[in-house]
């Protein structure tokens, strides 16, 4: 794994030395917008000389660190050889306003647009996607990298029926074991171990800090403390579990992964006691959102959504859960 991270660093160094400055319109015919986000945008384009269709990913220079751009490009170019990972095409350049690299085009949009709210997707399609994304994550993990941002918006379609999908957007990807700032955010995709980032540290009122004007001022009250955690593949396992739930139901299992969230608390009880006991627990309450699943799917969720990262299931185990029914017959629920 360390060999792969060293190779990535070397590739970034070499690319930085050879990164050309080009005018996009001189070499590419822009066809249409494929997507956009906080980083910039992705455009479908045609290479004028080769006649090759490709997706050009534009990163705004004023808000993008060059090293971050180089790492995403080279990770996609050198390591994303799995058929369900988007691969770069060996073209990277800069313009006065953007850093740009070319990648395989996925012209049918992303998975977010396929999932019908409150309904989800057909179960066979869900299993198709789950199989492909688990394979993509297994490949990344075997090389020592963690995606860290698995969600429907980052899964791209190569056809309308989800027979072939690709996991993309490696801007958050890091090597296993890297120390990063732990960030908690209000989302089911946020892992339970990220709750440490909500902790605040009391600052002694006698301390001083430098304000925006460069002057020292006394600090009072509480100040958030930066917390750090180690990058681990279990983060992707958790996201994979939430993704499967979203595809099956068109909903999220809970709004945020915190112990005082009612839906998450009920999940923990359901996970601990099982379906039969859950029926008694919720006989006079809203039933668990996980009681609609077959025992096979229930086992999958218990594995991927284990609250303890060391006990969490791995993407390569997905094959054990494929082929059987995941949703109960609604007439029997």
Residue ranges and their predicted role:
Residues 1-23, 31:
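Juxta-kinase regulatory segment immediately upstream of eukaryotic protein kinase catalytic domains
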Residues 58-79:
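Conserved N-lobe beta3->alphaC-helix segment of eukaryotic protein kinase catalytic domains
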Residues 141-158:
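Catalytic-loop of the protein kinase fold
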Residues 158-207:
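Activation segment/activation loop of eukaryotic-type protein kinase catalytic domains
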Residues 87-99:
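Short beta-strand micro-motifs within the conserved protein kinase catalytic domain, predominantly
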Residues 129-130:
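Activation segment signature within eukaryotic-like protein kinase domains
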Residues 41:
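Conserved N-lobe ATP-binding subsite of Hanks-type protein kinase domains
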Residues 96-110:
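Conserved short submotifs of the Hanks-type protein kinase catalytic core
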């Amino acid at each position: 794994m360390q060999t792969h991270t060293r190779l990535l660093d070397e590739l970034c160094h070499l690319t930085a030395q050879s990164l050309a400055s080009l005018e996009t319109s001189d070499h590419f015919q822009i066809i249409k917008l494929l997507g956009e986000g906080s980083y910039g945008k992705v455009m479908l384009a045609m290479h004028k000389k080769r006649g090759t269709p490709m997706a050009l990913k534009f990163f705004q220079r004023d808000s993008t660190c060059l090293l971050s751009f180089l790492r995403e490009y080279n990770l996609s170019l050198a390591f994303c050889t799995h058929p369900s990972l988007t691969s770069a095409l060996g073209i990277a350049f800069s313009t006065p306003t953007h850093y740009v690299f070319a990648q395989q085009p996925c012209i049918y949009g992303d998975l977010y647009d396929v999932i019908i709210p409150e309904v989800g997707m057909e179960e066979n399609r869900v299993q198709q996607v789950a199989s492909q994304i688990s394979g993509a994550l297994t490949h990344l993990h075997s090389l020592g990298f963690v995606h860290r941002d698995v969600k429907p918006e980052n899964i791209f379609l190569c056809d309308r029926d989800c027979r072939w999908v690709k996991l993309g957007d490696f801007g958050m990807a890091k090597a296993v074991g890297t120390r990063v700032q732990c960030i908690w955010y209000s989302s089911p995709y946020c892992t339970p171990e990220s709750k440490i980032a909500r902790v605040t540290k009391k600052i002694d009122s006698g301390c001083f800090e430098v304000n925006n004007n460069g002057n020292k001022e006394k600090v009072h009250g509480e100040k958030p403390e930066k917390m750090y955690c180690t990058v681990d593949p279990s983060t992707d396992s958790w996201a994979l579990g939430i993704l499967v739930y979203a595809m099956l139901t068109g909903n999220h299992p809970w709004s945020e992964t915190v112990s005082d969230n009612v839906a998450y608390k009920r999940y923990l009880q359901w996970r601990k006691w099982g379906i039969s006991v859950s029926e008694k627990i919720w006989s006079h309450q809203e039933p668990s959102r996980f009681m609609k699943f077959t025992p096979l799917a229930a086992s999958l969720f218990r594995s991927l959504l284990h609250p303890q990262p060391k006990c969490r299931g791995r993407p390569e185990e997905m094959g054990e859960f494929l082929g059987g029914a995941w949703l109960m017959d609604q007439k029997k629920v």
